[in-house]
Amino acid sequence: KLLFKYASLIKPNVTLLFYNYIIKKNFLDKFKFVFNLHYTLLPKFKGLDGFEKSLKSKHSEIGCTLHIAEEKFDEGKIIIQKKIKNLSKESLNIKKQKIFLLGIRILKLFFSDLDYYLKKTENLKN
């Protein structure tokens, strides 16, 4: 409720979410561009425990995904996705750091060409 109230006051053009809460339909309807940065490769590792599952998995790649936020958890169309090798010799902390750095790279890319990604989003929504 607080997020909705605050966002309604500032009326953002782009809303970027980083947390694991289900977004209500009224929030998604009110704002045109709502994105979620998910610290796993979607659609492989959805949900609240997706991050830990991906880090502990035997999959050859792990990564980070920026997607359109939808009412259904982690179901939105993918806007940007970056991958790295999942090296079994690396500790979980090293893997976490690498994933967070991928998230930063994704956000830099997204905001460096925002018009392109907003047009891409409009096309994916239609």
Task: Give, region by region, the residue ranges found by the protein language model.
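Donor/substrate-binding cores of folate-linked one-carbon enzymes
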Residues: P12, L16-K125
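Short amphipathic alpha-helix with an adjacent loop that forms part of the alpha/beta core around
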Residues: L2-I10
